[in-house]
């Protein structure tokens, strides 16, 4: 019995302790839950206080019913959204107003979402949609969580991959999710907390939001085109941004004003991948609402268009030109789903589905330029306008993208280079300058954004993997091998927009970085004082020695333009330029040749001295220098003509990379079709290392001429060649081979220049050798008999 009492006492104490722990921890959990609920309620009230358009209101089925029955709705302006089960009411009462049922839709678990408003009131047009892909970066949303018999909690969450995340805690109740479009809130869908997914709502107010199909993300989109004699501008209805800018090729037709020449890549794509060389490239509508038929060739795509034959590989909307983006990586468009407000031959006006953003594209009279006006009805921070991603240009066998901006620093206006971001740090944002304009260039072409109104300080540039925005060159056979997409990443340039609502104008130049067009643009945009934006600075000489060669290149181009005016051919201009330079340098070259001939005549005597004083190298050197002095010979003089020509050679190289007018300029059709690219005598399918798929004849001719010059400049000898002579001959042969390989992939214009220079040098050498009779030259050699 005593044992039972002890056991009972022990059990009682343990039970009491357990109950005490339960009460203690339960109270603590309850207190924690109450604190969390109070915190969530405070956050909800704070958000609702700062959001005028959206509010939580009670409702009843009739005026007689009390509003204290804990039935709540979300009010969006002049609309009510209700969640009910078992049926809906044709009319409800809230805050002194009757609301009529517009439409209802059934969702998971038998929940009805009903839309109420004033009878006869217009609803959102079904033709305006906001397309949201299922996979994209997270973006902020507003969530109204309904809990049993409680006022809904409103908080900020994140939407990604169809799920909602709440940093303040888990989501337990059914929730309505709203998207802030910049002009208010639009229902994004209803959130099922058990399944953790968002379902779209089939309601007029929510039809503005469409979840795009992964397999066909742009199936619902249309494209509109503005065009003139300088460009085609293809605008996407889905994004409101520019899908493509296509520049027509120059032709002999009187109405054609383009200066863009067709090059080999254009012809090769039209033959091997016609779908990728079609223009406009997508199903496009003109101002007469007529479909525009695609044509193969005839245009240059300034912007990358991805793979036109594969919808999934087209350029994503966030990388299209003149889109407005935000977010951590500046890669989230702030509005999608636009409708046409007005469309004629010169102007296209688009408005987002919620009316928050209006875009106006206007063609002007200036070549390759147009105007963009952006109108926002509600302010928002961290908005940026993008330049788009220029197509790839191969300049002297190199890929040379560049982002630059023009600004005033230290009371001086200048053009500044932007360091291109890398894959690891794909976004570069700087706030240390206020660009007057920003340029995104591929070398020969560029997109220039010029704000017409003051904007915040700063600029940005982003790195985009080549597989995301593939270049058209990756379609050349063998596909993605000759020019693999991954090897050619894209870059965008961005300017910030003011955070206040208003109208913002930009002048956009999208075309060749050519002297005549940029000067015309400068004149058209000069202010009352005659000051210009200095767009012509966008033409920059490139290379490590550009600070030295730029004056030479400018001089060469002036002479070439003069000869082009006389002959009508850039190729002949290069040859005539070479002749002029040879005439200018003739006295120096003649003196150098004469000096070298003397050196060759002195060679036997030098060998005799070296043999005599081979044990006294210092004495031999003194005797040789005395021999040079008596005959007025300097060994270095033979190098002077070549040294003087080097700046002109490098200047010509820079000129061919910087002068757009030479791009696509033909000299001998079928062989030399582009002076800024290697000549092509014939080609084949399978690439060969170093040689590629094309046979370039000019570098080989250059090597032959250099070899001939070395043979002509050698002195005729009666006996066997000395070691020094054999060494000189071997060096000459090696130089000819070296220049052949070095110049093999150089532009044909540079090869024409150097080949012409070498050929004229051979002729001058041969003539000089004839004039300088060997007997007379031998008498000019003075020997020190006393040595």
Curated annotation (Swiss-Prot):
Subunit structure and binding partners: Interacts with the Sec translocase complex via SecD. Specifically interacts with transmembrane segments of nascent integral membrane proteins during membrane integration.
GO biological process, one term: protein transport
Cell compartment(s), UniProt: Cell inner membrane
Residue ranges that the Swiss-Prot or TrEMBL entry lists as coiled coil: none
GO molecular function, a single term: membrane insertase activity
Primary role: Required for the insertion and/or proper folding and/or complex formation of integral membrane proteins into the membrane. Involved in integration of membrane proteins that insert both dependently and independently of the Sec translocase complex, as well as at least some lipoproteins. Aids folding of multispanning membrane proteins.
Membrane topology: Multi-pass membrane protein
Residue stretches spanning the membrane: 170-190, 565-585, 636-656, 688-708, 735-755
Lipid-modified residues, N-palmitoyl cysteine kind: 21
Top-rank taxon, per record: Bacteria
GO cellular component: a single term: plasma membrane
Family listed: Belongs to the OXA1/ALB3/YidC family. Type 1 subfamily.
Pfam families, per database record: 60KD_IMP (PF02096)
Gene source species: Chlamydia trachomatis serovar D (strain ATCC VR-885 / DSM 19411 / UW-3/Cx)
Name of protein: Membrane protein insertase YidC
Lipid-attached positions, S-diacylglycerol cysteine: 21
Keywords for the protein's UniProt record, in alphabetical order: Cell inner membrane, Cell membrane, Chaperone, Lipoprotein, Membrane, Palmitate, Protein transport, Signal, Transmembrane, Transmembrane helix, Transport
Leader sequence residues: 1-20
